[in-house]
């Protein structure tokens, strides 16, 4: 605990540990680590929780409402009769943190930067798929369209056409009017524009510090680039109510932007600190050194948090998470000298890369996960059951799909069938990973290990906690054989779960090398159903996909606990919006 208190002092928020944080300061201790502060690159809750406070989009959520949007950097918009053009009228008098005025050119630059770079491990696909029709970066799409043996001339021609689509996707009608031109109608486009990737960046500031020039001249140099190496990774170019002071990789310090168009917020300083150990976070909460902390489960809330004085547990039966948690299987593990698959062979000391391509193994592991224990013991009955990777309250969810619960006899039956009996005969060794500090995922990993190893002494599972950034990196590199992970919605439409989890080009499915033409065909077709009278058909397709997923089992959905927020009891203005990465905007809170 001492090292964290010393860090608070070193960051200049106060000179010593006190009974309460200053009245104008908000201190939040989270379990995860920020990956990137670039709106195009950031694609995890810890990163987006910062981005959504230092940057802004054209519209934003109206506090705790998922269906009501309020004008932010735009004041109004219209949609063409054919649903292909969205025109926004921008707010005048908005200044970036640099002092530069915001105009249409900044909005255009920000969206086109998404379309130009399209990092493979980012959310840029959210916009590319509807504005240009492409869900991957230009070179990836060129190889997909032309094949690996395409000539340079063929690739250049494809890239020229791709650039023309980027140019046509966003246009400035005048200094304060911007239009987005869709490749095809999409009912979720407005919802997509609320995602942090659509945040408006100070184009002059960005270009001056070495980012993409905003022109055709250097766009090819930026295709698919990892933006963690660029200036905006650690520097702020936003309009938000807070501006970045410092990010050292583990701690974010921000301060109120006095030139904010919406008026300076009450809270003047913010510290978001990544603290892996839950016990350390809880002690900081108890002492008053933190205003909010991450707590992993309802079991901890009931056993420890509710015993603390001066602490408030915010919860409401109406709160429903916009997320899903599953155990992923990798159908073809990647990476040389991969430490998670042992020998790389089915010899008792490892697993082959395509180990989980056998449905019998996936079923066996599913029957080794004690979902009742997760729901009843870890969540103490505060949660929701999941039959598929879609929130139960969202359209297209099928509550009638069966749930595989703990059944070691069935697990043994499927283990004996796996790989023609060789798995049972030879045994295996693999490693399950989770992000360090996340006791829920640790519990899931330990359950699977204990139950699998109890079936056959030749079955061996190691468990390896990884730092959050390393965990994400390993998952994106497709090097993990099996791992538990959650997904929070980017935009409020069921497509944002169905496509990532079940489509071969989905941001999650491609990490596990899951490819099934029948899934792809249905999901692609569902995306063409954009008219109001077609929505019932679209949601029936999603239910069918859920039933197919039960049979194919690309992942194991498991219960998700009911949301709660833990703060000191003097924090006011707290609310829960499941579409925000950290539940509420900093500008809305204060202290009594």
Regions flagged by a language model, labelled:
Residues 1-4:
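Positively charged n-region of N-terminal signal peptides that target proteins for export
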Residues 8-15:
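Bacterial N-terminal signal peptides
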Residues 17-20:
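Boundary at the C-terminal end of the N-terminal hydrophobic targeting segment
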Residues 29-81, 237-238:
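N-terminal lobe/hinge region of extracytoplasmic solute-binding protein
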Residues 62-63, 157, 161-167, 171, ...:
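Gly/Pro-rich hinge or "lid" segments in bacterial periplasmic/extracellular proteins
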Residues 65-95, 119-216, 573:
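Surface-exposed ligand-recognition segments of extracellular binding domains, strongest
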């Amino acid at each position: 605990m001492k090292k964290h208190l010393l860090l608070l002092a070193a960051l200049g928020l106060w000179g010593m540990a006190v009974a309460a944080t200053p009245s104008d300061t908000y201190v939040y201790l989270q379990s995860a680590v920020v990956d990137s502060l670039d709106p195009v690159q950031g694609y995890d809750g810890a990163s987006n929780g910062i981005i959504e406070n230092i940057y802004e989009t054209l519209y934003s959520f109206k506090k705790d409402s998922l269906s009501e949007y309020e004008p932010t950097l735009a004041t109004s918009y219209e949609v063409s009769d054919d649903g292909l053009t969205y025109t926004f009228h921008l707010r005048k008098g908005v200044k970036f943190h640099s002092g530069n005025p915001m105009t249409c050119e900044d909005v255009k630059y920000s969206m086109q930067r998404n379309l130009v770079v399209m990092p493979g491990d980012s959310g840029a696909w959210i916009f590319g798929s509807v504005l240009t029709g492409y869900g991957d970066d230009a070179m990836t799409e060129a190889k997909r369209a032309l094949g690996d043996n395409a000539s340079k001339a063929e690739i250049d021609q494809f890239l020229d056409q791709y650039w023309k689509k980027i140019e046509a996707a966003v246009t400035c009608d005048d200094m304060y009017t911007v239009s987005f031109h869709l490749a095809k109608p999409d009912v979720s486009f407005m919802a997509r524009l609320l995602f942090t990737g659509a945040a408006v960046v100070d184009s002059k500031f960005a270009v001056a510090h070495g980012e993409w020039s905003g022109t055709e001249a250097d766009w090819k140099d930026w295709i698919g680039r990892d933006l963690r190496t660029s200036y905006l990774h650690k520097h702020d170019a936003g309009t938000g109510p807070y501006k970045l002071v410092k990010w050292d990789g583990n701690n974010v310090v921000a301060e109120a932007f006095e030139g904010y168009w919406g008026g300076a917020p009450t809270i003047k300083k913010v510290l978001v600190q990544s603290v892996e150990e839950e016990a350390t976070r809880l002690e900081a909460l108890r002492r008053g050194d933190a205003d909010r902390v991450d707590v992993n489960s309802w079991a901890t809330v009931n056993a420890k948090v509710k015993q603390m004085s001066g602490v408030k547990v915010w919860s409401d039966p109406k709160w429903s998470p916009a997320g899903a948690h599953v155990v992923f299987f990798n159908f073809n593990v990647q990476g040389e000298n991969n430490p998670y698959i042992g020998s790389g062979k089915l010899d008792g000391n490892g697993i082959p890369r395509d180990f989980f391509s056998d449905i019998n193994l996936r079923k066996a592991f599913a029957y080794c996960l004690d979902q009742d224990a997760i729901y009843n013991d870890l969540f103490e009955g505060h949660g929701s059951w999941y039959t598929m990777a879609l929130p139960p309250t969202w359209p297209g969810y099928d509550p009638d799909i069966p749930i595989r619960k703990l059944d070691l006899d069935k697990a043994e039956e499927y283990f004996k069938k796996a790989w023609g009996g060789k798995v049972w005969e030879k045994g295996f060794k693999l490693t399950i990973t989770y992000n360090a500090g996340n006791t829920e995922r640790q519990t899931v990993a330990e359950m699977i290990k204990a139950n699998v190893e109890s079936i056959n002494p030749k079955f061996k599972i190691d468990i390896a906690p990884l730092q959050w950034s390393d965990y994400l990196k390993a998952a994106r590199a497709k090097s993990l054989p099996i791992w538990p992970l959650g997904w929070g919605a980017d935009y409020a439409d069921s497509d944002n779960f169905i496509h990532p989890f079940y489509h071969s080009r989905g941001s999650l499915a491609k990490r596990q090398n899951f490819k099934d033409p029948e899934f792809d065909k249905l999901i692609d077709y569902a995306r063409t159903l954009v008219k109001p009278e077609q929505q019932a058909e679209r949601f029936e397709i999603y239910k069918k996909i859920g039933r197919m997923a039960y049979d194919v089992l690309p992942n194991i959905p498991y219960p998700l606990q009911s949301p709660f927020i833990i703060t000191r009891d003097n924090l006011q203005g707290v609310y829960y919006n499941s579409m925000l990465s950290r539940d509420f905007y900093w500008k809305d809170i204060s202290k009594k």
